Amino acid sequence: LIALSLAACFALPLQAKIVTDVEGNKIELPDNVQRVADLWHANNQIVLLLGGANKLVGTTTSIAANPWYSEVYPNIKNVPVLTNGETIQTEELLSHKPDAVLLSKKSMLTEVEQAGLKGVRVSFQDFDGLKKTVRITAEVLGDKAPEIAENYIKELEGNIQFVESRLKGLKDE
């Protein structure tokens, strides 16, 4: 009985968490994600905002070439460029062993999953979508990212309310 109990303990998987992406897909990730490839240029800034820059193991051509990004995060020059936004360098992506791959395109998600990696779709076209993507990215990153995300969203909502209050009563001409 003791041997059976010990065997069961060793058979348990490492701690995991379930993250739900923008389409409602549930993805099982390690509880403590350490390596993230962010293959959507618009989301790389969110990773920085949430304090996850040190977890980046892959980025996009447009981010690597962006002078602003290099100014804010000089180490981006050392992060491998794994996509031009259309195609993924799958073999190189695999070599960097990401715990999670953030991306926006369904076709890329399929490619990542076929390679045996954990893909998490993020995407937004409006403020509600932005807030959802910030929360998803924070959940993937873990650590203090969820707290940072909620503070950012609170500030964003406050700014939106401020602008709406200033525009209230204005008429289209």
What are these regions (language model features)?
Residues 12-16:
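Bacterial Sec-dependent signal peptides at the C-terminal "C-region" and cleavage site
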Residues 17-19, 26, 109-173:
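Extracytoplasmic substrate-binding proteins
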Residues 21-26, 41-43:
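Short polar catalytic/cofactor-binding loops
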Residues 28-30:
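Core beta-strand elements of the Rossmann-like FAD/NAD(P) dinucleotide-binding domain
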Residues 33-37, 55, 118, 173:
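Residues that mark the start of a beta-strand
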Residues 37-96, 100, 105:
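A short, structured surface patch at a secondary-structure boundary
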